[in-house]
Regions:
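Short amphipathic alpha-helix segments
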Residues: 142-160
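Conserved short beta-strand edge segments in small beta-sheet-based binding/regulatory domains
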Residues: 161-167, 192-199
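Terminal, non-globular segments
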Residues: 175, 181-184
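C-terminal regulatory domains involved in ligand/effector binding and gene-expression control
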Residues: 1-77, 164, 191
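Short glycine-/aliphatic-rich beta-strand segments at the starts of folded cytosolic domains
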Residues: 129-145, 175
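Short amphipathic alpha-helices in soluble, non-transmembrane regions
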Residues: 151-157, 184-193
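Structural motif
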Residues: 27, 54-56, 94-97, 138, ...
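Active-site beta-strand/loop microenvironment that shapes enzyme catalytic pockets
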Residues: 79-127
């Protein structure tokens, strides 16, 4: 896959795995920040307050630069790690998977737990719509009305997303474009007289 592309999920999806009376309810979320992850996990712990464990793993960044696995009281590496393994083996980024366990009275053992958390995470992934996204960069441009036609010509050819525009005293636009296309867009815009770019 290209460096500025990654795979993620389009929306929340749910999975379920049952083993020896224990139920493992899994959720996969598209996420962008650790703050968002914290809020989701806290919300699920509140909603499923009577569950014994709320284990999770996440990967953030197009190249999975930031990741974490949490066993939430299960034996070390029996829950978070197999969940994380499913995220990585499915080549996903910017996702959180939470698996909630309701204990059924029969211990599963280390290998049983690893298998259960792996299967629960896999089921959530199987129910999710996987999409490809690009890593985009955002810039803010300012220019005068005099060069409006030149700016619009560049934008028509480069096709960035116009996130906002303001044409009052002077013209301002916030633009978003795929990371690999940004140097060319920036170069072409900076050739326009009186135009300035802010990151």
């Amino acid at each position: 896959m290209e460096e500025d592309k990654y795979r993620t999920v389009n929306a929340i999806a749910e999975g379920l795995y049952k083993e020896k009376g224990s139920r493992f309810i899994s959720f996969i979320y598209p996420v962008k920040s650790e703050e968002e992850i914290k809020d989701i996990v806290t919300g699920l712990k509140t909603k499923y307050y009577d569950a014994r464990h709320h284990c999770y793993a996440y990967c953030l960044g197009a190249n999975r630069e930031r990741f974490r696995a949490n066993d939430d009281g299960e034996p070390s590496s029996t829950a978070g790690k197999p969940i994380l393994g499913q995220i990585i083996s499915n080549d996903l980024s910017n996702v959180l998977i939470v698996v909630i366990r309701y204990f059924g009275g029969i211990k599963l053992g280390v290998s049983g737990l690893i298998q259960a958390y792996k299967e629960a995470a896999a089921d959530a992934i199987n129910h999710a719509e996987i999409v490809e996204r690009t890593v985009d960069e955002v810039i803010h441009v300012r220019f005068t009305y005099v060069v409006m036609n030149d700016v619009m010509k560049v934008l028509k050819e480069a096709e960035p997303d116009i996130l906002s525009r303001n044409f009052e005293m002077e013209c301002e636009m916030t633009l978003s474009i795929r990371q690999k296309d940004m140097p060319r867009l920036r170069e072409r815009l900076l050739k326009i007289e009186s135009l300035s770019i802010e990151e």
